[in-house]
Curated annotation (Swiss-Prot):
Span list, region Docks into pockets in the proteasome alpha-ring to cause gate opening: 410-412
Transmembrane stretches, start-end: none
Subunit organization: Homohexamer. The hexameric complex has a two-ring architecture resembling a top hat that caps the 20S proteasome core at one or both ends. Upon ATP-binding, the C-terminus of PAN interacts with the alpha-rings of the proteasome core by binding to the intersubunit pockets.
Organism: Methanoculleus marisnigri (strain ATCC 35101 / DSM 1498 / JR1)
Keywords: ATP-binding, Chaperone, Coiled coil, Cytoplasm, Nucleotide-binding, Proteasome
Free-text note on domains in this protein's UniProt record: Consists of three main regions, an N-terminal coiled-coil domain that may assist in substrate recognition, an interdomain involved in PAN hexamerization, and a C-terminal ATPase domain of the AAA type.
Annotated compartments: Cytoplasm
Gene3D superfamilies, A to Z: 1.10.8.60, Nucleic acid-binding proteins, P-loop containing nucleotide triphosphate hydrolases
GO biological process: proteasomal protein catabolic process; protein unfolding
Protein's UniProt name: Proteasome-activating nucleotidase
Main function: ATPase which is responsible for recognizing, binding, unfolding and translocation of substrate proteins into the archaeal 20S proteasome core particle. Is essential for opening the gate of the 20S proteasome via an interaction with its C-terminus, thereby allowing substrate entry and access to the site of proteolysis. Thus, the C-termini of the proteasomal ATPase function like a 'key in a lock' to induce gate opening and therefore regulate proteolysis.
Molecular function via GO: ATP binding; ATP hydrolysis activity
GO CC term, one of those recorded: cytoplasm
Coiled-coil ranges per UniProt: 15-73
Length: 412
């Protein structure tokens, strides 16, 4: 019995040790898991820090490179006048003299052509880089960046004219294969002519909205410059930019400013306008192919345009924009009143009948004046009386302007 009593505590002690070791192992395993998780987190943070370090080092090198570039001396602008071989070129510096210089091996020899602008090292005058073609700032201002909001739906009474201009301008740019199948060349240019206010410029803006081509617009008077050769240079640069941006459309508004009949005038101003016109004729249908560049021009004085400008090959299609008839005026009135709050007593057909001989600009002014009469009377809607007053007011303003114009002509 004594031996059994002595062995019992040993059994209890063994179980306690077993439980203790089991708990200890469990704690160690949990601790191991925690340490593993911490290790993974630290590895992830380490990779993130290394990535950030690489990024900051890259930015540091970039900033150092920019600082070095800013510290480097400026380069001289020159123009290539002749190419001797792949390593030697004759250039004319901006100061005037010409030099035979070396070219960098990093420059493509095909880019070095006579007339190309380049940068020269100040010390050795070696060609460092080739610059893109430079244009007058006025030329870049002619490029339309944002597409106009006007669409063909905003033009009333000109359905045949819209169809013609779409065939001549849009179709060659969007579906050139149709002309290839038939075996004809698409029209090169379109001339819009007609009385003022009939929608010539509006039609051109709709073309710019409808096509994805680059659109360059210029007023004819902008090409008339003070110094000899400046107008011709603007015309040449305008067409060069259009060729680079091809497919493109050039819209020349009021082309009669430079396209009038050539005569024997001896004034320097008239001779400069004629030089600009001759440059325009050469660009429109000269020795060089114009490429995928379409021309749209507008004028209200087709009778004074030079005959050389009107021949086929320059303007293959001349579209007359006439004064609207009754149905055309009604369509224009519906367009201008679609967002107006008009009363039930307004008869647009009657308004169209009373405005015979008016153009689209006059009809827009009538709608605006009718709205102003309604605002003056503190009404929310425009009634028929407002339209009648607007028609009378527009007619009175026209008669007063005509009287002053005639009076000035009589007693000038």
């Amino acid at each position: 019995m004594g031996d059994i009593a002595r062995q019992a505590p040993d059994k209890d002690t063994g179980e306690d040790i077993y439980q203790y070791l089991l708990e200890r192992i469990t704690n160690l395993e949990n601790r191991n898991l925690e340490l593993r998780e911490q290790f993974r987190q630290m590895e992830s943070e380490k990779r993130y820090v290394e990535t950030q370090k690489i990024r900051y080092e890259r930015e540091l090198r970039k900033l150092k490179s920019e600082i070095e570039q800013l510290r480097s001396p400026p380069l001289v602008i020159g123009t290539v006048t002749d190419v001797i071989d792949n390593s030697r070129v004759i250039v004319r510096s901006s100061a005037g003299p010409r030099f035979l210089v070396r070219t960098s091996q990093l420059i493509d020899p095909d880019l070095l052509k006579p007339g190309v602008r380049c940068t020269l090292n100040q010390q050795s005058l070696a060609i460092v880089d080739v610059l893109p073609t430079s244009y007058d700032a006025q030329i870049y201002g002619m490029e339309l960046v944002e597409s106009p909001e006007e669409t063909y739906e905003n033009i009333g009474g000109l359905e045949p004219q819209i169809e013609e201009i779409r065939e001549a301008v849009e179709l060659p740019l969007t579906k050139p294969q149709l002309f290839e199948k038939v075996g004809i060349s698409p029209p090169k240019g379109v001339l819009l002519y007609g009385p003022p206010g009939t929608g010539k410029t509006l039609l051109a803006r709709a073309v710019a909205h409808q096509t994805n081509a680059h659109f360059l617009r210029v007023v004819g008077s902008e090409l008339v410059q003070k110094y000899i050769g400046e107008g011709a240079r603007l015309v040449r640069e305008l067409f060069d930019l259009a060729k680079q941006r091809a497919p493109s459309i050039i819209f020349i508004d009021e082309i009669d400013a430079i396209g009038a009949h050539r005569n024997d005038s001896t004034t320097s101003g008239d001779r400069e306008v004629q030089r600009t016109l001759m440059q325009l004729l050469a660009e429109m249908d000269g020795f060089d192919n114009r490429g995928d560049v379409k021309i749209v021009a507008a004028t209200n004085r087709i009778d004074i345009l030079d005959r050389a400008l009107l021949r086929p090959g320059r303007f293959d299609r001349m579209i007359e924009i006439p004064l609207p008839d009754h149905q055309g005026r009604l369509a224009i009135l519906k367009i201008h009143t679609q967002y107006m709050n008009i009363g039930e007593d307004v008869n647009l057909s009657e308004v169209s009948r009373l405005t015979e001989g008016k153009n689209g600009a006059d009809l827009r002014a009538i709608c605006m004046e009718a709205g102003m009469f309604a605002i003056r009377m503190e009404r929310d809607a425009v009634n028929s009386e407002d339209f009648m007053k607007a028609i009378d007011k527009l007619a009175l303003d026209f008669d007063r302007h005509h009287f002053h114009t005639t009076f000035g002509e009589m007693f000038a």
